[in-house]
Amino acid sequence: MKLLIVGLGSMGKRRARLTKGIDDAIQIVGVDTAEGRRDEAKNLGLADAAYATIAEAVAAEHPDAALVCTAPLSHAAVIGELLD
């Protein structure tokens, strides 16, 4: 299974860590506009790959599911993009 986590701040990293703890075979693909957060998630082993945009991640990785871990006011826009 391939899981897309949109937002690699504290909540996104927590979800990635918990997911890996449940099943290390689940591939985590992260999305964050901040390069530092993408690098940190990969360096900590929390993301197998990380992208700057949802479109890039979906095109390259074809995830099976997604978690939205961004600021609450952005949830509707992120979910809309994921559904497209």
PLM features per residue range, with description:
Residues 1-44:
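N-terminal Rossmann-like dinucleotide-binding module
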Residues 15, 40, 48-84:
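Beta-loop-alpha module in the N-terminal Rossmann-like domain of NAD(P)-dependent dehydrogenases
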